[in-house]
């Protein structure tokens, strides 16, 4: 159930900013004299009357960093992606696991009610979730034009172009704004990507199984665009690549991207790509689908005051997936509501730069996770481990983030072990379930939905190698 019209984007932003200020520790937050960060949150909306809702933050994350391939571990004890959106989503999964634990204990005041399938639960109909992010997600959603200072920081832009990565700078040049949309032939009908033209007369080189579907021009309001926000994020191999032409032709839009690393390339897909995946598979992940009859979709995404384009957000978060067919029962393309707030995040780079344009700012190296759980709601990490971890201590349980794969898996297994055979879903009754990957693979409908999405829309998605998922 969506409580449309009973909350505003500014209310969601104000609630998130207030929670950030009052509930997160100073440890892990940026020093505003020299550092900036990004913040994301999940807000639970409960409809109590036709004209009233209760709003509360149930998960929050801050962060700007990812670790490179060389630092990945096969034990699942390091956080691979510490961008704010991903920290918030993993914190939300921790909250959902706690709520499922309450449901299993027959606690009335929890999110879930018994489903119609054995061992499965459903979200109460009066509950929905809104995702707040202080900034446009890195990747395709951030591919927007630089027009003017006022438009850049204040109002939605109707254009179709570029990503401003979490640590990139802006460069302004001038050019035209026409681009082509390409799609694969019938074999990969849902795979959509778009390529900026070098000029009107130039024909792009492409594989034989690509064909031009249509061409779009930017609205006349965007003809004054000087450039696009540049990014260090690279297009995934197998996708159309960036042309690096001057100005607005610099980037390819609609393609999968990898988050940048400092020297050591990451394996983390952009936040735009991951959020698009959530709009088909849900935010709960594979493990929690063993308990849930339906995926948990976001009802809305609210973006703080920042460079923003409605068209780019819609393209990135669900239009790229609009031709995905034959999803298993309960899965669908979630056309999430997307709105922008006029309230700016106090510790964002734009807000801090406006106060003093001469100071040199760097992204904060720490990430903070907060979940609405009774025990140890906070988690502060750096470089994928608890803040303060030494090289010698890496590998010990004390150094793990509470939202790393290994810890989420431990919490999940503790919940499974509390269930009798009669209480377990069919998928949990499978024989030989031992490793993290075993349990993920056993969530059959989730894996079927993921296969549909990957085969029809995200064919070049980079997956974590299997040997990094075999821990128990």
Swiss-Prot record:
Is the Transcription keyword given for this protein?
no
* A single GO BP: tRNA processing
Q: What is a GO molecular function of this protein? A: tRNA-specific adenosine deaminase activity
As recorded in UniProt, its EC number(s) are 3.5.4.34
In what residue span(s) does the A to I editase domain sit? 59-471
- Give the record's cofactor note, including how many are bound: Binds 1 myo-inositol hexakisphosphate (IP6) per subunit.
**Protein residues bound to 1D-myo-inositol hexakisphosphate:** 90, 274, 277, 405, 440
Q: Which cofactor does it need?
A: 1D-myo-inositol hexakisphosphate
Give UniProt keywords alphabetically.
Hydrolase, Metal-binding, tRNA processing, Zinc
Q: What is a single Pfam family found in this protein's UniProt entry? A: A_deamin
What catalytic activity is recorded? adenosine(37) in tRNA(Ala) + H2O + H(+) = inosine(37) in tRNA(Ala) + NH4(+)
Q: Which residues bind Zn(2+)?
A: 83, 138, 271
Task: State the protein's purpose.
Answer: Specifically deaminates adenosine-37 to inosine in tRNA-Ala.
Q: Extract the InterPro entries matched here.
A: A_deamin
Matching entries from SMART domains are given as: ADEAMc (SM00552)
Source organism per entry reads Xenopus tropicalis (Western clawed frog)
Instruction: Give the source's domain of life in one word.
Output: Eukaryota
Q: What is this protein called?
A: tRNA-specific adenosine deaminase 1
Keyword check for Hydrolase, yes or no: yes
Give the positions the UniProt entry annotates as the active site.
85
**Family (UniProt):** Belongs to the ADAT1 family.
């Amino acid at each position: 159930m969506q409580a449309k019209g009973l909350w505003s984007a500014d209310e969601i932003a104000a609630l998130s900013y207030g929670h950030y200020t009052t509930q997160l520790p100073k440890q892990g937050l940026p020093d505003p004299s020299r550092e900036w960060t990004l913040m994301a949150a999940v807000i639970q909306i409960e409809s109590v009357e036709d004209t009233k809702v209760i709003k509360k933050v149930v998960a929050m994350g801050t962060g700007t960093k990812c670790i490179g391939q060389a630092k990945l571990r096969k034990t699942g004890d390091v956080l691979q992606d510490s961008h704010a959106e991903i920290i918030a989503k993993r914190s939300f999964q921790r909250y959902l696991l706690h709520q499922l634990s309450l449901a299993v204990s027959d606690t009335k005041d929890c999110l879930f009610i018994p489903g119609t399938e054995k061992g499965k639960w459903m979200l109460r109909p009066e509950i929905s979730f809104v995702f707040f992010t202080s900034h446009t997600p890195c990747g395709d959603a951030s591919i927007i034009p630089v027009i003017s200072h006022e438009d850049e920081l204040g109002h939605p832009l109707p254009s179709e172009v570029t990503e401003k990565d979490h640590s990139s700078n802006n460069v302004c040049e001038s050019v035209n704004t026409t681009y082509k949309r390409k799609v694969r032939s019938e074999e990969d009908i849902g795979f959509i990507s778009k390529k900026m033209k070098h000029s009107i007369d130039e024909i792009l080189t492409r594989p034989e199984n690509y064909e031009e579907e249509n061409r779009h021009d930017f609205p006349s309001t965007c003809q004054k665009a000087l450039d696009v926000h540049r990014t260090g994020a690279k297009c995934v191999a197998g996708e159309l690549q960036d042309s690096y032409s001057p100005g607005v032709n610099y980037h390819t839009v609609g393609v999968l991207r990898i988050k940048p690393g400092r020297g050591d390339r990451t394996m983390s897909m952009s936040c735009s790509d991951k959020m698009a995946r959530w709009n088909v598979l849900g935010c709960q992940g594979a493990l929690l689908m063993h308990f849930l009859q339906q995926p948990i979709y976001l009802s809305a995404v609210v973006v703080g005051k920042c460079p923003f384009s409605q068209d780019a957000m819609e393209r990135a978060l669900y239009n790229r997936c609009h031709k995905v067919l034959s999803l298993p029962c309960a899965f669908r393309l979630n056309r999430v509501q997307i709105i922008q707030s006029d309230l700016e995040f106090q510790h964002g780079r734009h807000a801090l730069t406006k106060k003093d344009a001469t100071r040199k700012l760097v992204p904060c190296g720490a990430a903070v996770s907060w979940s609405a759980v009774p025990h140890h709601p906070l988690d502060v990490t750096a470089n994928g481990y608890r803040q303060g971890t030494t090289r010698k201590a890496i590998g010990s349980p004390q150094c793990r983030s509470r939202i790393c794969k290994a810890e989420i898996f431990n919490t999940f297994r503790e919940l499974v072990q509390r269930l009798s055979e009669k209480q377990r879903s069919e998928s949990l009754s499978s024989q030989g379930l031992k490793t993290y990957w075993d349990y993920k693979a056993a969530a059959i409908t989730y894996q079927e939905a993921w296969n549909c999405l990957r085969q029809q829309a995200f064919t070049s998605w980079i997956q974590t190698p299997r040997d990094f998922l075999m821990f128990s």
